[in-house]
Amino acid sequence: MKKIVLAYSGGLDTSVILKWLQENYNCEVVVFTADIGQEDDMSVIQKKAAALNVKEIFIEDLKEEFVRDFVFPMFRANTIYEGYYLLGTSIARPLIAKRQIEIAHLTGADAVAHGATGKGNDQVRFEFGYYCCDPNIKVIAPWRQWELTSRHSLIEYARKNNINVPLDKVNEPPYSIDANLLHISYEGKSLEDPYVEPDYTMLSRSLTPELASSIPEYIEITFEQGDPIAINDIPLSPANLLHQLNKIGGKHGIGIVDIVENRYIGIKSRGIYETPGGTILLHAHRAIESITLDRESAHLKDEIMPKYAKLIYNGYWWTTERKMLQSLIDNHKKKFNGTVRIKLYKGSVVVVGRKSNNSLYSYNLASFDSESQGYDHKDAEGFIKVNSLRLKKS
């Protein structure tokens, strides 16, 4: 191999991988860090890479692209995996993989590498993305190749090679954490026992509902063509809007979930997720659709959503079938305009109002107090008789 582009976070795993690649492949390693809202100090990451004699370091701000082209399209589908997971990690991998391949082409690299473990979903997501963007690229997955089979052995390797091992609040190696503008996930350590209650001091974006404000907060989110564009009438870019919702939702204990999910490779895993802004957006988007989308179309969306979510979770973002579903989902997005009013209180998101110039809601038809024009109560009798025919025993 001539040159390798490593997806580099500056954390323990990828710092060890960087050193390991240099030792075992005897070629230049380019590092690429995508700033997608993880709130890491990018200058520290650059210094870490430079300290390991890396000559080409790419640190790129991709927050707007991430939210605009990946998060928002996913939320147009009201996407949720297995009832709880808003796919915060899953949706970040396609963008990182795409840009990693672009950097490989730019620098003349013939291989890419990632830090995903051999037990997880991310190895699949990264590599599906690589092969969709460049079928001939060589892929190095150190966790499937080296003899460092546990986090303990990884830490020992790091210490022997003078690689800094970050410590958490109790002076121990931290949880396995993945963060971006959409969410933060925590895995490993005591969480590997699904019956043990989490130590919520781990949270960095949110207060727990018990510690959240005792005063409800009302906000309004404005939608245009299916995407949020403003909070309380203040226009915001996609990344800034999600950032603001994270701040607002975090102080009210919104979007903290403890789940056991089914990984694509067949293993069950437990994680704690913080998704304050995304949780608010999911409720708001469903609310604007409830008045702008007709019944059968809404039900169809609910039927295809699990398939769409499964495709993203399993790493199939770039596939034809995902793009086909996206086209179907986006077909009527021009109608999804309006404003949703939401109350936030101690972990709960309550939609308290919605309005749209494209609303299909009719007060005259829905009201018990008005004489409905165009609807005769007597018509319901025939409707019931016809639709009950199959229920009657012969």
Curated annotation (Swiss-Prot):
L-aspartate binds at residues 117, 121-122. PROSITE patterns: ARGININOSUCCIN_SYN_1, ARGININOSUCCIN_SYN_2. ATP binds at residues 7-15, 34, 115. Pfam families: Arginosuc_syn_C (PF20979), Arginosuc_synth (PF00764). InterPro entries: Arginosuc_syn_C, Arginosuc_syn_N, Arginosuc_synth, Arginosuc_synth_CS, Arginosuc_synth_type_1_subfam, AS_cat/multimer_dom_body, Rossmann-like_a/b/a_fold. It catalyses: L-citrulline + L-aspartate + ATP = 2-(N(omega)-L-arginino)succinate + AMP + diphosphate + H(+). L-citrulline binds at residues 85, 90, 121, 125, 176, 185, 261, 273. Keywords: Amino-acid biosynthesis, Arginine biosynthesis, ATP-binding, Cytoplasm, Ligase, Nucleotide-binding. GO terms for biological process: argininosuccinate metabolic process; L-arginine biosynthetic process; urea cycle. One of its GO terms (cellular component) is cytoplasm. It comes from the Bacteria. One of its GO terms (molecular function) is argininosuccinate synthase activity. Pathway: Amino-acid biosynthesis; L-arginine biosynthesis; L-arginine from L-ornithine and carbamoyl phosphate: step 2/3. Its EC number is 6.3.4.5. It is found in: Cytoplasm. SUPFAM superfamilies: Adenine nucleotide alpha hydrolases-like, Argininosuccinate synthetase, C-terminal domain. Homotetramer. Belongs to the argininosuccinate synthase family. Type 1 subfamily. PANTHER family: ARGININOSUCCINATE SYNTHASE. This is Argininosuccinate synthase.
